[in-house]
């Protein structure tokens, strides 16, 4: 499963292609990934401008100009390919992956096509309105200022689980995994 470093690498690759761009076409080639896509997924995203692309733990977050955010979790095998635009980090590939695993397509006003592939379909996407606190239960980022020795001592106090188990708990620290 992609962990924080891999998700951040994906964010950095997508950022120059998506930030500030309008989604001129969105195609959901199936109604679900791990979970059903929102019924208005295509309608809410088509025509939206992506204001910024960020990451929280293992989640990619695309802030939209419609007071909403597109949330993406890559699951185990989710990945993006970019066609029609040069992207740093080698995300723009000449030969696309197996099309049967191409589940969501995004086209931008800059003629880029961003395709989400997920062979095992463990990833998911959702759209939520600004002010929604669905990620509030995540712990601090491991590279953020809140994650320090005092925080760990408090988080581990009176717990019977192993340190590894506690560190993998996304409520304690967001984005860590077992890779």
Q: Locations of the language-model features?
A:
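Extended, highly charged segments
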Residues: 1-68
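Basic, nucleic-acid-binding surfaces and adjacent catalytic neighborhoods in DNA/RNA-processing proteins
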Residues: 22-41, 54, 80, 153-179
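Phosphate/anion-contacting hairpin/loop surfaces
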Residues: 70-175
């Amino acid at each position: 499963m992609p962990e924080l470093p891999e998700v951040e690498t994906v964010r950095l690759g997508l950022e120059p292609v998506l930030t500030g761009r309008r989604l001129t076409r969105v195609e959901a080639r199936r109604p679900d990934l791990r979970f059903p896509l929102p019924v208005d997924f295509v309608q809410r995203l088509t025509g939206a401008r992506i204001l910024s692309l960020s990451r929280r733990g293992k989640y990619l977050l695309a802030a939209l100009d419609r007071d909403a955010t597109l949330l993406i979790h890559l699951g185990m095998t989710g990945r993006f390919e970019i066609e029609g635009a040069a992207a740093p980090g080698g995300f723009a590939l000449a030969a696309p992956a197996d099309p049967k695993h191409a589940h969501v397509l995004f086209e931008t006003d800059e003629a880029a096509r961003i395709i989400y592939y997920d062979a095992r379909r463990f990833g998911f996407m959702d759209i939520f309105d600004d002010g929604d606190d669905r990620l509030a239960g995540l712990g601090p980022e491991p590279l953020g200022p809140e994650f320090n020795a005092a925080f760990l001592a408090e988080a581990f106090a009176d717990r019977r689980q192993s340190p590894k188990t506690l560190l993998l708990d996304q409520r304690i620290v967001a984005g860590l995994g077992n890779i």
